[in-house]
Regions:
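Class I S-adenosyl-L-methionine
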Residues: 1-101, 108, 274-284, 291, ...
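A contiguous loop/helix-start segment that scaffolds small-molecule binding in enzyme catalytic cores
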Residues: 2-5, 17-19, 56, 70-72, ...
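Short, glycine-/small-residue-rich phosphate/pyrophosphate-handling segment
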Residues: 106-141, 150
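Phosphate-coordination loops involved in phosphoryl transfer and adenosine-cofactor binding
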Residues: 142, 251, 274
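Conserved alpha-helix/loop element of class I SAM-dependent methyltransferases that forms part
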Residues: 233-250
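Conserved Rossmann-like nucleotide-cofactor binding loop
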Residues: 260, 285-286
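Conserved SAM-binding loop of SAM-dependent methyltransferases across substrates and taxa
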Residues: 261-273
Length: 311
C-alpha cells in the first residue's frame, strides 16, 4: 500500500505543487478525506475519482483501506502529523509506504495572524480527547496555551470550565475557518466567549493576563469548611502522607468518597493535573463548599452529590 497524505487549509481553491498533482492524476488511486476536504478539492480530482468520506468512528474507513491495497490519497487539515490522521494511518498501516505534503496547521495560521510566539506555547488538543491536558496547562501556570477544539469542547465550553475552576486570568484569541473566505479572528474575554457564536472548525490561544500561584500543601485554614464544623476535614499532614502513599503522581484516576470539603481531591489534582478526579459526597451543603474550594485553588474535578452507591 502507498499512502499520500496531503494537508490543506480552508482556502477555497488549494494550490498544489506539480509533485502533488502527479499523485492526484496517478492511475488506480483512491481518495479519502472529510466532507469539507472534498468540497475544497473536488474540482482538482479526476472526473471518475473514487472518494471515501472519513467519519468517526474510523473503523469502517480503515477496513476499506485494508481491502484495497493500492494507492490512496488522503486529505487532511493542516499538517497531517500534528495531532492529525497521519499518525493514525502510520500506526494502522506500519508496512505502507507513506509520503506527507503538509501545509501550515491551524494554530500556526492563527499565531501568524496574531504575531504570537507560538514556539513558547503549551499545545493542547481537545479533539475527541478528555480535559486533562488543558487542566495540566492551567495548573502548571502556562503563559500561552494553544488549543485544538472540536464540536463538543468548543470555545464556550472551554471558557465555562476555566471560569468554573478559577482560571479567569486568561484572554482568548479565536480563529475560525482559517485560510478561507469565511476566516474570522477575534479577541474575547472568557465571559464574552460564554455566549459568543462560533464557526467550526476553529482553534484558539489562551494568553495569561495575570499570574496566580501554584498551590501544593495548602494550609487547612484556607479551605472553606462545613458551617460550625471547621475541623471536619482531612488535615494537611494526613492529606499529603495519604497521597504520597497512593503514589498519586503516577495514577490516572482518583475516587474521593466522602469528599466533604474536597481537600483530598484538590491536593491530588494540583499534584497531578492529568489525574481524573471524582469527588463523592452525600451532604448537600458540600456541593457549594467543594465548588468554592476547587475554584479558589484552581483544581478542575468532577463532583458527584448524593449517595455514593447511586452516584
Amino acid at each position: 500500500m502507498h499512502l499520500t497524505i496531503i494537508g490543506i487549509s480552508d482556502e477555497s481553491t488549494p494550490i498544489f505543487s506539480s509533485e502533488v498533482k502527479e499523485r492526484l492524476e496517478a492511475d488506480g488511486v483512491r481518495f479519502a478525506g472529510g466532507e469539507r476536504h472534498r468540497e475544497l478539492v473536488e474540482t482538482q480530482l479526476p472526473a471518475n475519482a473514487s472518494w471515501t468520506n472519513i467519519t468517526v468512528p474510523l473503523a469502517p474507513f480503515l477496513q476499506e483501506m485494508r481491502e484495497y491495497d493500492g494507492a490512496w490519497v488522503v486529505f487532511a487539515s493542516g499538517d497531517p502529523l500534528f495531532f492529525g490522521i497521519g499518525n493514525t494511518l502510520r500506526r494502522e498501516f506500519p508496512d505502507a509506504t507513506v509520503e506527507v505534503f503538509p501545509t501550515f496547521n491551524s494554530l500556526q495560521l492563527l499565531a501568524h495572524k496574531l504575531l504570537l510566539p507560538y514556539g513558547t506555547a503549551s499545545v493542547v488538543t481537545l479533539t475527541g480527547r478528555p480535559w486533562q491536558a488543558l487542566d495540566k496547562a492551567l495548573v502548571d501556570n502556562q503563559k500561552l496555551i494553544a488549543v485544538l477544539t472540536d464540536k463538543v469542547k468548543t470555545p464556550s465550553t472551554i471558557a465555562q470550565r476555566m471560569l468554573t475552576f478559577g482560571y479567569a486570568n486568561y484572554t482568548m484569541f479565536l480563529g475560525e475557518k482559517l485560510g478561507g473566505s469565511e476566516e474570522r479572528v477575534r479577541e474575547l474575554s472568557l465571559e464574552e466567549a460564554l455566549t459568543a457564536d462560533f464557526i467550526h472548525p476553529n482553534c484558539l490561544y489562551l494568553q495569561q493576563n495575570a499570574t496566580r500561584p501554584i498551590r501544593q500543601g495548602i494550609p487547612d485554614a484556607e479551605f472553606q469548611t462545613l458551617e460550625g464544623r471547621p475541623k471536619m476535614m482531612t488535615k494537611m499532614a494526613v492529606r499529603l502522607a495519604s497521597l504520597a502513599a497512593m503514589d498519586i503522581r503516577n495514577r490516572s484516576v482518583l475516587w474521593d468518597v466522602g469528599a466533604c470539603t474536597g481537600s483530598i481531591s484538590i491536593e491530588a489534582k494540583l499534584m497531578n493535573p492529568l489525574l481524573d478526579v471524582h469527588s463523592f459526597e452525600v451532604r448537600e451543603e458540600s456541593t457549594a463548599i467543594v465548588a468554592a474550594n476547587a475554584r479558589k485553588f484552581g483544581a478542575p474535578l468532577s463532583y458527584h452529590g448524593g449517595d455514593f452507591g447511586g452516584a
